[in-house]
Amino acid sequence: ALHTPFGISGGAQAMANNVLVTLELNGGFIGYGEAAPLPPYNGETQAQAMTVLAAAQAWLVGKPADDWRALATEFRTRGGAACGSAQCAFEMALLDAVNRRDGVPMWKYFGGAGTALETDMTVTTGSPEQAATDARAIRDRRIRMIKVKVGGPKGPGYDLARLVAIHGVAPDSPLILDGNAGVSRADATALVQGLR
């Protein structure tokens, strides 16, 4: 169960029904990936992800892992494109296994110059008071950037009240507004105008 429901404009989810993927290469090197289907966002389910991933076992065994891009493309063409979370989990597990085998950290494999990464944390849909509480908890975790889910039936005025509450407890935090396709053009315009 999640600490708090993860709410977006299309609905909320109180339980994360994810799928852990393990992929073993010849030589015993194991990679891990995770599918995180979110039914309110894209309709994907845990069962769908598991079905897509299980189907890959029939053709994957014995394939060379070095050309991971070709395997990722084959995964998509053999049904993986229908479930983005399964595709992500497969690619993560494959890359993790290859990098473990080669003794190369993922960041270095992709040409990264460091080991630090700035990320954000999300304030989901909810009341202005809850948004302020969540933003304060994010700041207490020393996360600077805050993503805010916006959109839904209460309209841009409600989202603006939430943003004001967040700014009140985290005035120096950059905010990322995320409507997940749940904001109309008119509501987006009203929201942007309200931010001025």
Predicted regions and their residues:
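Metal-dependent enolase-superfamily TIM-barrel catalytic cores that perform enediolate-based chemistry
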Residues: 108-196
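Metal- or metallocofactor-binding catalytic centers and their adjacent structured scaffolds
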Residues: 24-101
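Short beta-strand scaffold segments in enzyme catalytic cores
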Residues: 19-23
